[in-house]
Amino acid sequence: MLREKVDLPMPIGYNLVPDSLNKEKAAISAGLYYSGYEVSTNRPQKLNNFDVVVMWNRWNENEKLADKLESQGGNVIIAENGYLGTDYIALARSEHNGGGWIPYADLDRLEALQINFKPYRTDGEHILVCPSRGFGSKKMRQPINWTHEIVQELRNYTTRPIYVREHPGNWKQNNNHLSLAEDLDHAWACVIWNSGAGIHSLMQGIPVICCADYWILKDIASDIQFIENPAMLDRYHAFNKLAWSQWSIDEIVSGEPFIRFSLC
């Protein structure tokens, strides 16, 4: 019986992280290579079955390309700044921050990432509103007038003082601002669209009101009408899932996250 040898093409990993993020781009290129991809920095117009694209955030031209590739069945991974500090990069399929898929394994990753919680706070004075920066994909970005509208809506449910903390990325230079920890001091609750400030609020034991349809910790947040009686749910499982979206540079270089994405 004659057998014909078939040479399958090597899958391509397209690294579209901008050159300005040289450390992150180099790590992702290495990780794609060590997980079995031929690495390219070109912008593809079509993907083969096992190809993958890694892009930094999903908005503007990246969103247009991601929409096109996914409509063809392509595999798109979104990278962005980590949610637990500068030592990590966040990775998720299709969308970031709870809007996409992460390679969650039912294993404890919290200890490795040294995530610790303070007990839930049972007192507090003010409501802290933390808007997002205002850009992103159609699915995830905060509505333009959200901050003004949410402050007005909060007045229907509480008489507490309401403070608005603008996103640090929108701060003007030479202005003095309190740290997030200082703004959270004596806070009763933190209100977000889907800002990362909510992650740190929950770690500090301060309940979160989330107004977006998608957020990485949506399962343990409350709706606005519960501002005076916010949920104080167990945080372990939600944060353990979040931890599987956070990868160190060394882990990314090893290729582990891309292998996990390729298996599902």
Predicted stretch roles:
Residues L16-L21, W59-N62, G134-K138, G169-N170, ...:
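Short acidic, S/G/P-rich loop/turn micro-motifs used as interaction or catalytic elements
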Residues Y88-E125, M140-R141, K218-C264:
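Leloir-type glycosyltransferase catalytic cores
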